[in-house]
């Protein structure tokens, strides 16, 4: 008897586990859509999202999927900044298959003033079983002009 008969067959309704590259693509799409729900749904329940370069009024980290959801809902909901494009500079694989490092530039507009801005960034994503477990998000939030400036 062949060993293939003993291998488990996934149920047709079972979603495929996303690779780190696929998670990164979904992450960028959530940014473009300004969707805190789509973003948070990429995270494990106990994930941590860190901002090593903090900006005034912005927390240094979110702990847990629901904190990510609430934090981005508040930040994106209050901001007149609209992301127009995420320019993907590079994505680097590491010796750890669950880690991807991505360079990008966010291009957007401040809808209250029609001001264009660009903000370079770097993400280090840890993805386990298709969900983000940790993010180190190196973005200089001061690159986004304020609504009143």
Name the predicted role of every residue range.
Residues 1-45, 146-149:
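Short, low-complexity N-terminal intrinsically disordered segments enriched in polar/charged residues
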Residues 36-93, 98:
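A solvent-exposed, acidic/Ser-Thr-rich amphipathic alpha-helical stretch
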Residues 86-91, 106, 120-126:
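Hydrophobic/aromatic beta-strand elements that line small-molecule binding cavities or substrate pockets
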Residues 91-99, 126-133:
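A short, structured loop/turn motif at beta-sheet edges
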Residues 103-109:
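Generic short beta-strand segments
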């Amino acid at each position: 008897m062949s060993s293939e008969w003993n291998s488990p067959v996934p149920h047709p309704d079972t979603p495929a586990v996303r690779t780190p590259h696929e998670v990164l693509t979904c992450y960028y799409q959530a940014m473009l859509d300004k969707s805190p729900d789509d973003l948070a749904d990429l995270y494990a329940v106990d994930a941590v999202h860190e901002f090593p370069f903090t900006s005034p009024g912005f927390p240094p980290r979110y702990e847990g999927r629901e904190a990510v959801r609430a934090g981005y809902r508040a930040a994106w909901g209050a901001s007149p900044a609209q992301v127009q494009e995420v320019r993907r500079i590079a994505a680097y694989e590491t010796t750890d298959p669950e880690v991807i490092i991505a360079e990008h530039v966010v291009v957007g507009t401040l809808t209250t003033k029609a001001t264009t801005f660009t903000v370079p960034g770097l993400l280090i994503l840890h993805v386990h079983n298709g969900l983000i477990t940790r993010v180190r998000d190196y973005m200089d939030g001061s690159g986004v002009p304020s609504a009143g400036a």
